[in-house]
């Protein structure tokens, strides 16, 4: 009867991770839309918010490259708005690292499937940024519902 119990989770992730999430088609999603968000508004602090990928180390040359790319993306997003673009048009320069909020609802069978793929890596190594959110969520959920999730083992938890 796993299909009759559900769980809803709010993820705060980057757009790249959100694209991984929505591949789980049996979930239901509500996601913040860059089409209607105008990041030049006070509501957003007149800036874009990005999430540093977990594989970039602060102080490294790769981090510096990424950070500069994020600054350029923000600069040209606002330039396009100032030059007359709508937020829908200007969003074309926004990076995958842009923060988004996604509310995900699914039945317990689908959450088991999600954790097997995205936390335990049963079909191969999951995307590192997806693991970064899936593993802590799995550990929390397994703690509350060991009967439902106790048989799923993480590579580092035997």
Task: Go through each PLM region and give its residues.
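Family-specific signature for flavin-dependent thymidylate synthase
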Residues: 1-158
